[in-house]
Amino acid sequence: MLGQYYYHEILRKTIIAFGTIFNDIHIRHRDGAGKETSDMRVPLAYGPMQKFLARLEQQPDLNRAVQITLPRMSFETTNIAYDATRKGGITQTFKASDGSKLRKVFMPVPYNVGFELNILVKLNDDALQIVEQILPYFQPSFNVTVDLVNVIGEKRDIPIVLDNISFQDDYEGDFATRRALIYTLNFTAKTYLFGPVSDSSEGLIKKVQVDYYASVDTENARRELRYSATPLSLIHI
């Protein structure tokens, strides 16, 4: 049974959709008079937090251009797990038409994809600005629309649930040591995985016709009335 190639890019699309949520967050700095002095878009990259911490430790000279390294955000996938609470019928098939033929695929399988979003900053106020722009949208979930299977036009709203928030201050050493405050937000994306899509042997219904007769003898009786209908989608093809 295994070995039939197919690739809907569902996990990849889910990762991209998650990152898109946080790719336009800004922080602003003000002087003592309350005048805005800077507006910075926070960089976002896919990768583990340890990668960025190692770079800060190995290249302390980057402190001369703080905006290049901090603040910044990173995210990564932490786990993929089956979600039995959203389980549907196993033997049912999902059917869709592209206008010329009918396609079918078995009902999707629910999976949860875990994400970790790390916010690395030098100043705690920067972290608070970023976190406050994120939290109000998650109550505790935020829906994103993902085109799961292009060939059948299957789009679904994927809830992304905020699970928990943690904080740590990775500052150890003397005053010359680079400080990094880290806020970690854990999320769960409730997505669906589809199997291979195949052509349905049932064919596409292009026209429906119903005849009414005045007698049960349909061969000899005169037809009294005929109704016919063409699906709206076929009229516009």
Can you say where each PLM-predicted feature lies in the sequence?
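Acidic-leaning, charged glycine-interspersed low-complexity segments
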Residues: 107-109, 129, 138-197, 204, ...
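Conserved small/polar residues in nucleotide/adenosyl-binding loops
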Residues: 235-237
